[in-house]
């Protein structure tokens, strides 16, 4: 019979016990769930050789090889490592990075896969040894359709468009192409001019370039908005939307500041959203508005985690 120490030791390496057995499911993590044919062949071969022949793809886009006996785990790890693949994705640290298909999707406002790769390298790989108060999930979505649910991640990135509207160029068409294209019905024609209801507009970008007279320009910068503190499961919390919007190049720096703030202020076993609620969104916004957290990075990472008194 396996001991709790044995079960815990492999859980930290990406192996979760299968209920009622002494076998485990091992998670293979890639960049935002992108797999090459060779990687898929390797996963299938590992499943047949060391598991029960079944593979499950998780909600965070990892490939989970089912039914690996405890004593075969080292062999499975070595087999996959020889093929450039590794088990992981568990524990109180950065979890597998998820991203939608915004890179190729017609609604994608940003290159989600490219941004996810940067985040994967910097945080999932670069900070894999950093122990955080709790799990830390990062998701990248290409548009407000929210297929990847950015607002339910500890940090969620959502691509949108920083478009503008020039009322002087609006001719008040009876059939306004901008209004017709708007999925949230945020545009209406009032007294011969298009009016945009900002409370309904999601900056999805669908209307960009639709006006033949240029009231909505054909080009609009792609930007990112960032949600922090989202959770789903036994406790639900929609992520708090940060006040600013950011370029894709600025996103990794913001994520790093949020993570350092969480490392410094979060209690052990407290999710980021609970830390934000306890300390306040204004405090987080103020902290990430400067580079102080980055300057103190080494000290913050070296400090022990906070325990509740």
What feature does the model see in each segment?
Residues 15-20, 51-57, 185, 231:
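Short, flexible, solvent-exposed loop/turn segments with mixed acidic/basic and small polar residues
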Residues 175-195, 202, 206-223:
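Iron-sulfur cluster-binding cysteine motifs and their immediate structural context
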Residues 16-17, 155-159, 224-233:
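Short beta-strand elements
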Residues 2, 24-173, 200:
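Small-residue-enriched alpha-helical segments and adjacent helix-cap loops
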Residues 231-268:
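A hydrophobic, small-residue-rich beta->alpha segment in the mid-to-C-terminal subdomain
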């Amino acid at each position: 019979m396996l001991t709790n120490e044995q079960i815990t030791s492999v859980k930290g390496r990406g192996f979760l016990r299968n209920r009622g057995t002494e076998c485990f499911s091992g998670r293979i993590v890639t960049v935002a769930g992108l797999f090459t044919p060779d990687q898929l062949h390797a996963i299938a071969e590992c499943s047949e050789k060391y598991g029960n022949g079944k593979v499950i793809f998780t909600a965070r886009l990892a490939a989970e090889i089912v039914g690996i006996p405890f004593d075969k785990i080292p062999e499975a790890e070595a087999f996959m490592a020889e093929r450039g693949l590794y088990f992981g994705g568990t524990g109180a640290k950065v979890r597998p990075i998820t991203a939608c298909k915004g890179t190729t999707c017609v609604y994608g406002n940003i290159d989600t896969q490219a941004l996810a790769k940067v985040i994967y390298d910097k945080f999932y790989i670069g900070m894999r040894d950093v122990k955080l108060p709790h799990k830390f999930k990062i998701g990248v979505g290409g548009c407000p359709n929210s297929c990847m649910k950015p607002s339910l991640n500890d940090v969620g990135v959502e691509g949108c468009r920083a478009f503008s509207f020039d009322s002087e160029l609006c001719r008040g068409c009876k059939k306004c192409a901008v209004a017709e294209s708007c999925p949230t019905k945020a545009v209406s024609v009032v007294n011969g001019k298009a009016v945009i209801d900002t409370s309904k507009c999601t900056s999805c970008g669908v209307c960009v370039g639709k006006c033949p007279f240029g009231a909505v320009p054909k080009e609009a910068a792609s930007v990112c908005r960032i949600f922090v503190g989202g959770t789903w499961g036994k406790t639900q919390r929609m992520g708090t939307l940060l006040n600013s919007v950011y370029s894709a190049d600025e996103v990794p720096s913001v994520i790093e500041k949020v993570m350092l703030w969480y490392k410094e202020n979060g209690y052990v076993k407290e999710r980021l959203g609970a830390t934000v609620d306890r300390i306040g969104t204004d405090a987080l916004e103020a902290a990430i508005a400067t580079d102080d957290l980055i300057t103190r990075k080494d000290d913050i990472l070296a400090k022990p985690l906070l325990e509740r008194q």
